[in-house]
Amino acid sequence: MNLNVEKILIIGLGMIGSSIALASKSKGIKVYGFDKSNNSIKEALEKNIIDSKVESILDINSKDFVKKVDLIIVAVPPKQTLDVLNDLKDIWNTDVTITDTSSVKNHIKLNGASNIILSHPIAGSDQSGISAANGDLFKNKKNVLCDPFNSKKGHFEKVDNFWKNALQMRTSSMSVTEHDLIFAMTSHLPHLVSYALIDSIRLSNHDVDDNAGGGLKEFLRLSGSNSEMWRDIFMLNRVD
C-alpha cells in the first residue's frame, strides 16, 4: 500500500472540510469534493477550494472512483458521520483509506471495516460554513486518532502521515472510550455551560452589555459555534 496521499475526497464542505481542502491544495494534493448542498459545491469550485466535484455517494462507491483517490475524509456533523460511513460500505476493505473529523466517537460502530481510521482534528472556530474556510486552521494543532476496527496494516500510517505532512498537525492515539471521556471534560462541557449561561441571560431580560467582562465574552464566543454540530455532540456523548 502506498502511504503517500496525493489525491483526496472530502465529504462535507463546511468550515472544517473546506479548511482541510485549502490546506491540502497548498501542499499540491488534488482535492475532490462532495456535499449535499449544490450551493456549497458551486461556491467551493468558484473559490478554488476544491479541484473537482463528485455528483453522488453512488459515484464514490464505484470501483473506478476508488482508484482515483488515496484518502476519503468525512467532514460532516457527528450524527451524520455514522450514516455516511455506512453509505460507503461498498468500498470498505479496499486500499482507499477512510477517516472522519467527528469530535465524538462512541456512536461509530462498524463491523468489518478494515480501512477506516477515526480522526479528531482539534481545531475549530465560532464561525461555520464554507465562507469560514481557513487553510491555516490546523497548523500546529493536535489530532487524536482512534483505531477501534483493527485496521489493515498501512491505513493508520497513511492517515497519520496525511495529518502531519499535509496539515502540519501533531498526532496522538487513544481508545474511543478514553477520547470521549477526555473531550467531554475539556471541550464538550465548557460549550454546554456556555449555551446554558447565555440562554439564562437572554431569559432574564436584563441588559448586561455594559457590565460584561472578558469571561462572559469568551462564553459568548463559544455559544456562537455551529448549533447543529454541538447538539449532536451533546446527545451522542452523554450517559443516560
Task: For the regions a language model picked out, list residue spans one by one.
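Residues at the starts of beta-strands that form the adenosine-phosphate
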Residues: K7, K30, N115, K142, ...
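Short beta->alpha hinge that forms the Motif I/post-I loop of the SAM-binding pocket
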Residues: K36-S37, V76-P77, T101
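N-terminal Rossmann-like NAD(P) cofactor-binding module of classical short-chain dehydrogenase/reductase
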Residues: I72-I73, T99
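NAD(P)+-binding Rossmann beta1-loop-alpha1 motif at the extreme N-terminus of oxidoreductases
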Residues: M1-D64
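Rossmann-like NAD(P)(H) cofactor-binding subdomain of soluble oxidoreductases
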Residues: Q80-A132
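An anion/phosphate-binding loop that grips the pyrophosphate of nucleotide cofactors and donors
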Residues: V69
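Internal alpha-helical scaffold of NAD(P)-dependent oxidoreductase catalytic cores
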Residues: G135-L222
